């Protein structure tokens, strides 16, 4: 989790995976940053806001506090990170302790309200709407996407590094499904992957079934539920159920 020792940020750093710069002190903000703070009413959702300086941070956080959208307690625990602009992608993996192999189950991205509604408007209407309504980034679902093949090797490299880091710092390491969530950025004539977040569980998108990646391995696309079932069945056959349980 994000607020415990040796959390996902610790693991990403130890794995050598590129992440946005983290500002532990808002006074140190020196570029466009995104503040991720839990909502007051729904702690499982986060209220995001952008700022480019400490003054900007104070003004925007004060507005959210006055509206009771967030609390002072949660603001103190907020993650402040460099704003990275790119094509958002969630890389949904499955690691099998039985075969010691990493599989890419699929890739997807998020649908967010009211952001998606704003983005679908013509530019002139967007400008008018933004005079009265501020964007929100509340997750409402996912849809499947693909990435170009030249990025697949890099994605697998990140996944393998993360698995190795979990084994080193949290034995027995990650088991089964997890996702590295980030964006593909373009810089100096090449693309790179920046990871913002980690989902250490079954990812929230059933749409990964409709990407081609699991089909390359199995001959047909499979869901996370089916893949977990196959792992349990194999563990029972091998008498190694203990390897996939904690």
Language-model-detected regions and their locations in the chain:
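Short beta-strand-to-turn element immediately C-terminal to the catalytic PLP-Schiff-base lysine
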Residues: 48-53, 94-96, 145, 185
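Alpha-helix N-cap recognition
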Residues: 22-25, 51-56, 174
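Conserved N-proximal alpha/beta basic substrate-recognition cap immediately N-terminal to
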Residues: 1-31, 40-41
């Amino acid at each position: 989790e994000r607020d415990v020792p040796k959390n996902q940020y610790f693991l990403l750093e130890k794995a050598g995976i590129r992440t946005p710069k983290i500002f532990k002190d808002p006074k140190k903000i020196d570029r466009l940053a995104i503040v991720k703070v839990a909502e007051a009413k729904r702690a499982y959702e986060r209220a995001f806001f952008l700022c480019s300086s400490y003054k900007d941070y104070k003004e925007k956080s004060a507005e959210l506090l006055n509206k009771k959208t967030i609390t002072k307690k949660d603001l103190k625990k907020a993650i402040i990170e460099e704003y990275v602009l790119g094509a958002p992608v969630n890389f949904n993996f499955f690691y099998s302790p039985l075969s010691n192999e990493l599989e890419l189950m699929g890739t997807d991205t998020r649908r967010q309200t009211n952001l998606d509604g704003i983005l679908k408007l013509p530019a002139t209407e967007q400008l008018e709407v933004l005079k009265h309504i501020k964007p929100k980034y509340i997750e409402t679902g996912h849809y499947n996407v693909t990435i170009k093949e030249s990025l697949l090797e890099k994605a697998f490299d990140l996944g393998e590094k993360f698995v190795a880091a979990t084994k080193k710092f949290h034995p027995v390491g990650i088991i089964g499904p997890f996702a590295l969530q980030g964006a593909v950025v373009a810089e100096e004539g090449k693309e790179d992957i920046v990871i913002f977040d980690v989902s250490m569980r079954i990812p929230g998108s059933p749409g990964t079934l409709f990407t081609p990646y699991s089909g390359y391995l199995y001959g047909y696309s499979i869901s996370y539920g089916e893949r977990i079932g196959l792992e349990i069945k194999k563990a029972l056959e091998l008498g190694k159920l203990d390897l996939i349980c904690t």
